[in-house]
Amino acid sequence: MSFAGMLNRLHGQPESYDKKSKYKFGRTLGAGTYGVVREADGPSGKVAIKIILKKNVKGNEKMVYAELDMLQRLTHPHIVKFVDWFESRDKFYIVTQLATGGELFDRICDQGKFTEVDASQTIRQIMTAVDYLHDNDVVHRDLKPENLLYVTRDPDSDLVLADFGITKTLDIKEETLTTMAGSFGYAAPEVMEQKGHGKPVDMWSMGVITYTLLCGYSPFRSENLRDLLRECTAAPVPFHERYWKDVSQDAKDFILVLLVPEPEKRWTSKEALGHIWLSGKNATDHNLLPELEAYRRRARLRRVIEIVKLQNRIAKLKEHEEDPSESDMGDAQGASDNHKGDGSRLHALGLFAVREAKQKQESLQVEEELEKESRRRSFSNA
């Protein structure tokens, strides 16, 4: 045992804590209820390290060990790679591949052109990852554009599925999960109704992602749970002529077999991979970028609000650290640096920033209302 290791044992640190010295921590990439995600330099290059406060998962430590076990078993070109893990007296550290190529929609909007053919091949990549998970009885439960990342800035970079924080491994193939999980607007009806759910929830989310990728807006516009549930279960999926006239019928059919309210009637990942649209044969060469750019503008304004929330989460997490002098929680500066132009101005996160963020959120709501009204008029005239 090294001298440093002996000192760590004397200070009550677990044996694996020695690994921490291999990493130099950098900017904060995000924060949640249980901890933060930091960029770091390691022996094999840059990585992402998820830091979880043990105090925040007390009594639910098995949740962390389950995530670790699952990540170590998953090996797929379109799933973020597990690197290592270690722990301290008060924290767990999960080290994974760092995807630096940007989120799905940001990367697409930086291109000169993005067609329906490109969209079908993008969705195919993600669907192969979902199919791999389902073959291994794993349900992701939080599929959304923000969790779809490019590994590098290279034009031919792989797209990977990330964030397995609420993913569940089924004990038996047909096990039913009952906890609320997922993100508003992407969660399946059975999740919102708390009826019990399984693999079909991922297929619903894939339907929402595909729809948004093809037109730049969500198929469901409600802003509260009750209205959203009604919209998902009682109303037909809308394909507004103005935005969908240049999109193939195959693409619409693909979406419709995924956005089926009854989970038992929803297509599986295997069936979806066999759909003709994912072959790209009948997909059009219509450029989707104008609609997607509008989506990105709305997303950027939402990020301004998220940076304020991020700083508040980090502050709360720091309060729970046993040794604040050796904090690993970082700050929100790094996250704002990831989105220069829309978030970097808020690094101080003072009262002015909060006020500015609220004003931008209000402006966004006004813009969306005007957009909805414009669509209603155009739809009625279609």
Swiss-Prot record:
Recorded protein name is Calcium/calmodulin-dependent protein kinase
Where along this sequence does the record place binding of ATP? Answer: L29, G30, A31, G32, T33, Y34, G35, V36, V37, K50
Question: Does this entry carry the keyword Aminoacyl-tRNA synthetase?
Answer: no
What is this enzyme's catalytic activity, as reactions? L-seryl-[protein] + ATP = O-phospho-L-seryl-[protein] + ADP + H(+); L-threonyl-[protein] + ATP = O-phospho-L-threonyl-[protein] + ADP + H(+)
Q: Outline the segment boundaries, as ranges, of region: Calmodulin-binding.
A: 291-301
Q: Which residues form a coiled coil?
A: none
Record keywords, A-Z:
ATP-binding, Calmodulin-binding, Kinase, Nucleotide-binding, Phosphoprotein, Serine/threonine-protein kinase, Transferase
Which terms does the record give in the GO molecular function aspect? ATP binding; calcium/calmodulin-dependent protein kinase activity; calmodulin binding; protein serine kinase activity
EC number(s) from the headed UniProt entry: 2.7.11.17
Top enzyme class of this protein? Answer: transferase
**Spans annotated as Disordered:** 318-344, 359-382
Q: Which residues of this protein are catalytic?
A: D142
From what organism does this protein derive? Answer: Metarhizium anisopliae
- Domain of life (superkingdom): Eukaryota
Provide the family line. Answer: Belongs to the protein kinase superfamily. CAMK Ser/Thr protein kinase family. CaMK subfamily.
Location of the Protein kinase domain: 23-278
